[in-house]
Every structure is written in structure tokens, then in C-alpha cells.
A protein has these predicted regions:
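C-terminal and inter-domain tail/linker signature
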Residues: 1-172
């Protein structure tokens, strides 16, 4: 019996975390307080570093508003979800057209995509914490703020006496 209850709790926790992705995609910031715990906190490497600690649903609202200004057509696609205890892990892909300031770079009009991993802590049927790790290097490469891995390998292999080998072609 307790095993069934636990499975139901895990599925409920997954649904709560997935609801946050729906709120993001639907631009339903009015629903953030329904999904986020009053003591919500965000931490980790995010696409937008918060101005101070990200505490409370209002802080996440501000983060999403900045996100929508930079990438008005931003969408998140959930690629995987796993739950254990009060934790839910989401692997997702973000993407959209870079129209406003993002990572300090003005809009380029280019489409950008990157992956992120969220570890959500669920309490009282709401998201208490979002510990996120964003692939900031992928974003920086696409915005021209960092060289791509292929560019680095080509530069290293052109140095006389370098033992670095070029990366295989992406066309394989």
C-alpha cells in the first residue's frame, strides 16, 4: 500500500514540476504563485543571474519577464523527468529568437538553443527550490561571446609543435 502511495506522490511531484514549464511556455505569470512555494528560492547557474538572491515567486516572475524581453518566442521542451522523494529532475531544451539583451549582448535576431537541468524540491505541493544548471557555454558560443570547441581545436592544432588534434568533423 505505501508503495502505491509513494508512486502517486512521485507522479504528483512530477506534475508540479511540469506545470512550471507549462506556465513558462504559456506566459502565465499570474499562475506562478499557484506553482511556487511562498518560500521559493532559485539557485545555480541560470541564463539570467538574478539581481540578488532569487527568493519568492515575485523574483521568478522578474526573471521570466527579463527572459521574455530577450527571447520573446522562448519555449522550453522537457526532454526527461525523474522523481525521487521530494526531488524532481527535469532535463530540458530552451530555444527562441534572440531579440533583446541576453548575457549582456543586444538582440541578434538569431535563433539560439541550449540545455538545462533543474533539480526541483517539492514541499506542500509546490516548488520550494529550483537548483538549475544551464549550459551557459552553449549560449555564449551562439552569441559570439565564446569560441566554439571546434574553433579552439583548430587554433590549437595550428600552433607549431602542438600535440592537439583537431576535433572530428560534425558531418560524420
Amino acid at each position: 500500500m505505501s508503495r502505491t502511495i509513494k508512486a502517486i506522490d512521485l507522479e504528483a511531484n512530477k506534475a508540479i514540476a511540469l506545470r512550471l514549464a507549462e506556465v513558462f511556455n504559456g506566459r502565465r505569470l499570474d499562475l506562478l504563485e499557484d506553482v511556487l512555494h511562498p518560500e521559493f528560492r532559485g539557485r545555480g547557474i541560470s541564463a539570467f543571474p538574478p539581481e540578488g538572491p532569487e527568493v519568492g515567486p515575485g523574483a521568478r516572475r522578474k526573471l521570466y519577464e527579463k527572459f521574455y524581453q530577450a527571447i520573446p518566442d522562448a519555449r522550453v521542451e522537457v526532454l526527461g523527468v525523474v522523481a525521487e522523494g521530494d526531488k524532481v529532475v527535469l532535463v530540458d531544451r530552451f530555444g527562441g529568437t534572440h531579440r533583446g539583451e541576453f548575457f549582456g549582448r543586444p538582440g541578434t535576431g538569431d535563433r539560439i538553443e541550449w540545455m538545462a537541468i533543474h533539480i526541483y524540491t517539492i514541499r506542500d505541493s509546490k516548488v520550494l527550490e529550483d537548483a538549475v544548471m544551464t549550459d551557459a557555454l552553449a549560449i555564449m558560443e551562439q552569441l559570439g561571446l565564446a569560441p566554439s570547441a571546434g574553433t579552439i581545436a583548430r587554433r590549437q592544432s595550428s600552433i607549431p609543435g602542438s600535440k592537439s588534434k583537431s576535433l572530428p568533423s560534425e558531418s560524420h
